[in-house]
Swiss-Prot record:
PANTHER family: RIBOSOME MATURATION FACTOR RIMP
InterPro entries given in the database record: Ribosome_maturation_RimP (IPR003728), RimP_C (IPR028998), RimP_C_sf (IPR036847), RimP_N (IPR028989), RimP_N_sf (IPR035956)
Family: Belongs to the RimP family.
Pfam family, one: RimP_N
Protein name per Swiss-Prot or TrEMBL: Ribosome maturation factor RimP
Statement: the UniProt record of this protein carries the keyword Aminoacyl-tRNA synthetase: no
GO CC term, one of those recorded: cytosol
GN (gene name): rimP
Localization in the cell: Cytoplasm
Amino acid sequence: MSDLTNADNEREPRLITETGLDQRLADIIEPVLVDLGFRLIRVRMMNQNGATMQVMAERNDGTMTVQDCEEVSMAISPVLDVEDPVDKEYHLEVSSPGIDRPMVRKSDFVRWQGHLVKCETSILIDNRKRFRGKIVEAGTDGFTLERDQIAYGEEQKVTIPFTALSDAKLILTDDLIRDALRADKLAKAQAANQNEADDEE
């Protein structure tokens, strides 16, 4: 897993964005999140248990605590009440992207290089639109997967342009859990050190 500084990914646009009502919701929510120091991962309006607006967000370092979810919820609720983009009652659910997270930015592919991902493309690449494999390289224009399941005659590696990506998600493995926990522990230690430095000033 690669480390990125906050400055590298703070304003990085998402590769995969919403459409329709979800896009309108993202347009309302994202500026509020950015002002608080968070990044929007995804917004989805779902019709389960009534209507639920699911907002996935994270700090620039990739972390998201329960307190962060509460802070985001308290900040976006009044804005959503004023804008009133949904014409029915709904439940607001704010969460972290989780360990098996959606991959929505170029930096996600850099950060999680070496891990398994499943993805879909909007166009055929090597005669298919669905892929699964380990991210072996990520650049400015796309990423390379080493496929773990190939059919006869297919190449082991495939390069997918970011412009063709329509969906991508990490696959839960023991290595992913280990690296995610390690990254979370490091981020918490850095935050604690920052808080100590702020207290001394």
